[in-house]
Amino acid sequence: MEQEGQNTFEFEDNPEPLDVAAGERKLVTQPYDYSVDQLTSHVDKRKILLMEVPYQREYVWDDAKASRLVESLLLNVPIPVCYFAENEDGTWEVIDGLQRVHSIVRFLKDDLALRGLSVLTELNGKQFSEISARDQRRVESRTLRFVVITDESHPDIKFDVFERLNTGAVKLAPHELRNCIYRGAFNDTLKDLAQMDSFRRAIGRGKDSRMRDEEMVLRFLALHENLSGYKPPVTQFLNEHMRRNRQRRPSQEVVAIFDATMQHIASIFDGRAFRIIQEEGKPATNVNRALYDAVSLSFAFADLGSITGKESRIREAHHELLSDSTFQVFIGRATADRTRMHGRVRKYSEMLKSLDIPSSLPHLPEA
């Protein structure tokens, strides 16, 4: 079993092209030129949500770096554009430029004493209230360029733009971006289900800090609801499921199915169900997402009551299937392909059926 904080995941193949009709590729942006004074006013009035949105990275700039930004404002040095996303309620979230925005607000609220200035050295050690009235006005009147991606934009194009702007030293994982764009009751439920003891035991207990656990839960819910209708790209499929259900929590029945599925998988495989077997016969360190699809969905549609007494046979058949060349293709490369998605779930379900475990798996097109 893995230790806390050590869970790792195999990533999908190279990013897939978006499947958005030409006429629907709508991206609406609105540029604004705001003074620093207007910026702080918007933060105070919660027009701009700062450091209160779960996806946003922590404030990591030290005082010296923040001070140099303030010095740039005073010297009229150009400041890079800041990008925001507009929510349905009209509020803005910082997508790119959080460190800059937060540093400016800190200074105007006397939460930053300048240090390490190389040009305006006489201001070192001073807070905003301690600099001259002239310098205060220079800072407050300095204009910043904001670009807002409005709520009118097509959600998949919007997601793609966020990925392009995702240029930090450690880029946001796909579900960290979803956590920003699709905040609501459904997203909250994903977090709750990812903490379920049954799920933690099924995947090996390791807690992933990049929200990949929540993405695994999302995969289950989205595919369980519409496996036969699945089509790639998988990122877009998951995005659409979150967008459509943003303000709705999954039904108690679906949550119960998820919990029961993970309980049975955990008890049978002891945290190794979603890991392929390496050449030396040991389970891989990484969680294989394609194998997760096959195992979790097959169990979800199976008659779990028929499993009792067959646990060892299931483990043996599972290991044999992992050596099957066709199944290896289904969980190997290009795993988001519709045929391979359906193929791996169908083949695993057939394995369970061969052990007299009935299944209600919906019809899956061959191609």
Located regions from the model:
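Basic- and aromatic-enriched surface patches that contact anionic nucleotides/nucleic acids
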Residues: 2-41, 50-243, 308, 315-320, ...
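Amphipathic alpha-helical interaction surfaces
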Residues: 107, 223-227, 244-247, 268-271, ...
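Short amphipathic alpha-helix initiation/capping segments at coil-to-helix junctions
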Residues: 210, 251-258, 284-292, 307, ...
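Small-residue-rich helix-loop
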Residues: 234-284, 291
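Long, highly charged low-complexity segments enriched in Glu/Asp and Lys/Arg with interspersed Ser/Thr
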Residues: 251-259, 336-362
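C-terminal hydrophobic structural anchor segments
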Residues: 275-326
